[in-house]
Amino acid sequence: MCAPAAEGKRFQPAEQLSFSAEDDGVKNPVVIPRDVLTILSKDKLVREELEHEGLPAEEIPSSWFSASAIHLSHANAAYLIVMSVGPVQGANTTMFWAFRPTHSGHDLIFTGGGHTLTAKNTRWNGYREIETLSVVMQKLATVVYRFDGTRYTRYKDKLEEIK
């Protein structure tokens, strides 16, 4: 009788690299740390929704977001991709944020909106490029972001007819 190759090893789900506004959340959710929620509460759209709901920033509902652990760099540390799934989400579009772990918590290194976010296999400064897709004026808008050493910045935009 042959034993499975992975016998004795814990199953680790594949890392999610693509996130969509059409999904109810990420595929392998992780708990969103309190310091990340605090940073999210300072985002303009989130702050406006907190005011609309009559909630103080300290009571930001974690149910408004879904987070997944991802390796954006070659480091062993797991970064977080957070997507809005609650009232901050729009029609067929959502907000995405990426956080880098630090000794004292997390740093916000990406903010962007769209229908889809993909962490690409191509890298810049050791970090995966991030690509967002959205539909604008009945055209497909693609934006590629690159890590500049501190945070992700817009690198390339493309607007094309939907095929």
Regions found by a protein language model. Give the residues of each.
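Acidic, small-residue rich beta-repeat scaffolds with periodic aromatic anchors
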Residues: 1-47, 119-163
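A short beta-strand motif characteristic of beta-propeller blades
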Residues: 54-59, 107-110
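Short consensus segments that form the blades of beta-propeller domains
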Residues: 57, 85-91, 134-136
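Signature of short aromatic-glycine-proline-rich micro-motifs recurring in repeat-based ectodomains
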Residues: 57-69
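Short, exposed beta-strand/loop patches in secreted or surface proteins that constitute
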Residues: 67-73, 114-125
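Acidic/hydrophobic-patterned starts of short beta strands in beta-sheet-rich repeat architectures
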Residues: 71-85, 124-133
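Structural motif
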Residues: 89-97, 138-144
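Surface-exposed loop/turn elements that mediate protein-protein interactions on large endomembrane-trafficking
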Residues: 97-111, 145-156
